[in-house]
Amino acid sequence: MITDILPEVNKINDAGLRSKVIAVWEEAMAFRGWTPEILSSIPFTLLAENVRITFIEHVRTVCKMCIACDEVLTSAYRNRKTPIQRDYLIAGALLADVGKLFEYEIVDGKATKSDFGKKLRHPFSGVGLAFKHDLPPEVLHIIATHSKEGDAEKRSPESIIFHHVDFIDFEIVK
């Protein structure tokens, strides 16, 4: 089911890493009984009004943007490019917002911030769940530092890429 809603997971070459990413998504979806249909209809952010981009669209789009960014850098700089671990970049892109499945809940047919989400934002819950599933620290770092919580940290190259593409998608809709 996860590969149906997030086919980009198949771009992770490392089968073990891929299966861990899928396991994180499966557990997060089970927490509140999230379905692909619901995740494909709720807005990707609650920090702006009248958001027409859905949660799944956002996750997929920023993942594709990360891949495209890495491809452009590789094409331009070849062997002079700062090394990017593509599997970690993709895994981090797919998991950065998975904590929103804990942060959000549906009330009267509308996505709202849950009591849990009022206390812990998605980077924290996302890291916790990914840690539980033994994701490597490089991926945990992307999840942890992708949003404002990571501004005081030194971001890895993969986290820098994800942070910027995520904010491109966010800033143009808010």
Feature map (PLM): residue ranges:
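Histidine/acidic-rich helix-loop-helix segments that form or flank divalent-metal centers
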Residues: 77-80, 89-90, 127-174
